[in-house]
């Protein structure tokens, strides 16, 4: 699993944190997955910071190093949410209509815009739900 994949999963799990009406199974799996993927996010932030602080490199070289590192293996196992827990997520999220998500953020935006729940659920399922 690459850092990019782990970061996407971590972000989706964090977005699910805004949903307060999860049933116990979904909440339990969300918490455990969050703990798992947070490790890669923390490691990534430290690595990115170290690369950014390199004084002898140009911004172009730093950006290339960051992009290269993002595609490297982060050392985490591929952990996913069960279908049963995902069904509970769907039940909790559907009434919201939309959810703030990094999936729709452009480089010019500072905040995650709202996207339709169906779009968010599909991305969540593709990244985090057992097949």
What are these regions, as identified by a protein language model?
Residues 1-131:
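A composition-driven surface/loop motif
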């Amino acid at each position: 699993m690459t850092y990019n994949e782990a970061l996407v999963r971590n972000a989706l799990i964090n977005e699910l944190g805004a949903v307060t009406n999860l049933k116990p199974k979904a909440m339990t799996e969300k918490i455990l997955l969050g703990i798992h993927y947070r490790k890669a996010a923390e490691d990534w932030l430290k690595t990115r910071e170290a690369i950014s602080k390199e004084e002898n490199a140009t911004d172009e070289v730093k950006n290339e190093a960051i992009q290269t590192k993002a595609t490297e293996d982060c050392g985490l196992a591929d952990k996913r949410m069960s279908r049963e827990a995902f069904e509970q997520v769907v039940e909790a999220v559907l009434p919201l209509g939309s959810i703030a998500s990094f999936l729709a953020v452009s480089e010019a935006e500072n905040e995650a815009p709202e996207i339709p729940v169906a779009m968010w659920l599909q991305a969540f399922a593709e990244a985090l739900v057992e097949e």
